[in-house]
């Protein structure tokens, strides 16, 4: 199993706007080979931002990689730049291979 995460620093006071964008978006993940699930999680607040992370699980790293090169990925991310005023910097990607679990 592979876990893909993007960390987002969201401008303080824009959290609800950010969450609304995520709730209303078209993911285009239904039926994508190897996709298991997705969560958006909210973390700690800092002086100027609130930390969020997107968390998706995939059958393998290759399944995730294939999705990032797909038309479904391009369509799902085509409007990502429209909300840049909500972010401090760019998202930070982290990928993890699951080595143990319950």
Where are these regions (language model features)?
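Glycine-rich beta-strand-turn "strand-cap" elements at beta-sheet edges
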Residues: 2, 39-48, 78-102
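Short, well-ordered beta-strand segments in beta-rich or mixed alpha/beta enzyme
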Residues: 2-8, 39-70
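Context-gated lysine
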Residues: 9-16, 42, 69, 74, ...
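Non-catalytic surface loops within mature trypsin-like serine protease
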Residues: 10-12, 60, 97-100
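An amphipathic, aromatic/His-enriched active-site/gating alpha helix that lines ligand/cofactor pockets
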Residues: 20, 27-36, 57-94
